[in-house]
Structures are given as C-alpha cells and as structure tokens.
C-alpha cells in the first residue's frame, strides 16, 4: 500500500471502549461525523448489532488513539483492545520475522505500519461515517472518511464481534477490492493465500 493510504488505516488501532449516545465527554457529535479528541468512557450497550453501537465503538477507538500523546494508553495496549486475537497473532508473527531480518541486515522486512501510522499522534482526527454494512451480523465493514491536518482519506474497516465488542480484523482503502493489511501481512509471511494449508 502507498504510505498516503496507510495514513488513513493507521489511525484505526485505537478502536475499543464501548460508549453510548451522541455525546462524548461533553463533545457534541452528530450521527454522520465527529471530532475524536477526548477519551470515551466504556459503557455497556444493550445491543451491539446496531449502527449506533458500531459508530460508538469506532469513535471510542479514535478517541483513545488521539490521547496516546497525552498520557493515554500506549500503542501495544491499544492494539490489544482494538484488534481481534487473530489479527494480533498475525501482527506478532510479522514483527518477529521483521526483527530477525533487521538483525541479520536483511532489507526484506515488513514496512507497512497499518492503522498505527499517520501524521502526528495526538492530532484530532475528524471521522465521517459513510456506510456500515449489515450491522445485525457479527462481521461488518465500516466505510469512513478520515481527515486531519488538512489531509483526507477513505478507509474500509472490517470489524468482528469478539469478547462482546466490535474489534478490528482488517482495514483497507476503499479501492483495494478486498486486499487489506491482513493479506499484506500473510503475503509477507509466505502464507499461500489460495491454499492456506500449503
């Protein structure tokens, strides 16, 4: 993926802590867009299979990401909160292989930082929700337009219900036709994408 496109994906690591309503710590939001610049306190949601619950979860992640520089959660903790267990395991394998390659002076390491890389941690990110597919299912795609520091980009965030909340399972640009961060990592690890067993 291009670094520009990764900017958009990077901010997504911070998506966990469920919240309810259209107010986040005194910051007014509407159902279509918000500026994520404060921490959202976790609150139970009666039914997570609603568009509102999905938006609240995504909003909470962005709030946490924006607070990293202000003494909030560190990125490792954020990853563990925001991502599915299978994505975390894949990220760990990629990091291990990359560290070995770097230690051996090999330049074939994984450079894509995914959702964690964007211009200026702590910079408020404006999130516009463009679409959420089938919120009544356990797997959804959320189409977002992100903007910060005068930049804009579109991202497709794939979420799965795990441990009672929506977690990031993959992320990609709008126009990648299904190819995302997960597939890039699998390719780097040499996993046969047509036949995962071989």
Predicted segments, located by residue:
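Short, aromatic-enriched amphipathic alpha-helices that serve as compact interaction elements
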Residues: 47-70
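C-terminal motif of bacterial Sec signal peptides marking the signal peptidase cleavage site
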Residues: 16-19
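Hydrophobic/aromatic beta-strand elements that line small-molecule binding cavities or substrate pockets
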Residues: 129, 155-161
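Short, low-complexity, disordered segments immediately C-terminal to signal peptides
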Residues: 21-44
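Bacterial N-terminal signal peptides that target proteins for export
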Residues: 1-7
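Surface-exposed, charged secondary-structure patches
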Residues: 86-151
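Low-complexity, intrinsically disordered terminal/linker segments enriched in charged
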Residues: 135-139, 143, 147-154, 170-198
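Short, solvent-exposed secondary-structure junction/capping segments
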Residues: 63-100
């Amino acid at each position: 993926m291009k670094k520009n496109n990764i900017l958009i994906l990077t901010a997504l690591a911070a998506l966990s802590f469920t919240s309810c309503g259209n107010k986040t710590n005194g910051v007014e939001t509407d159902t279509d867009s918000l500026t994520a610049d404060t921490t959202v306190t976790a609150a139970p949601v009666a039914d997570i299979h609603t568009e509102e619950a999905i938006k609240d979860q995504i909003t909470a992640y962005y709030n946490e990401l924006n607070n990293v520089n202000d003494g909030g959660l560190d990125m490792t903790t954020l990853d563990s909160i925001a991502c599915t267990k299978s994505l975390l395991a894949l990220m760990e394998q990629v990091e291990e292989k990359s560290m070995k390659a770097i230690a051996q002076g090999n330049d074939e390491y994984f450079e894509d930082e995914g959702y964690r890389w964007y211009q200026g941690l702590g910079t408020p990110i404006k999130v516009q929700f463009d679409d959420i597919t089938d919120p009544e299912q356990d797997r959804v795609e959320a189409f977002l337009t992100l903007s910060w520091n005068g930049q804009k980009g579109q991202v497709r965030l794939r979420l799965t219900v795990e441990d009672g909340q929506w977690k990031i399972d993959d992320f990609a640009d709008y126009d990648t036709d299904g190819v995302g961060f997960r597939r890039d990592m699998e390719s780097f690890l040499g996993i046969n994408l047509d036949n995962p067993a071989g």
